[in-house]
UniProtKB/Swiss-Prot annotation:
UniProt source species: Rana cascadae (Cascades frog)
Protein name: Brevinin-1CSa
Known role: Antibacterial peptide. Has activity against the Gram-positive bacterium S.aureus (MIC=2 uM) and the Gram-negative bacterium E.coli (MIC=32 uM). Has a strong hemolytic activity (LC(50)=5 uM).
One of the GO BP terms on file: defense response to bacterium
Disulfide bridge partners, by residue number: 18-24
């Protein structure tokens, strides 16, 4: 897929994981 999407995913996924696990 597009490198831009990969970049966005790299920023979004950690945030979602942080919020989901309450380990910010």
């Amino acid at each position: 897929f597009l490198p831009i999407l990969a970049g966005l995913a790299a920023k979004i996924v950690p945030k979602l994981f942080c919020l989901a696990t309450k380990k910010c």
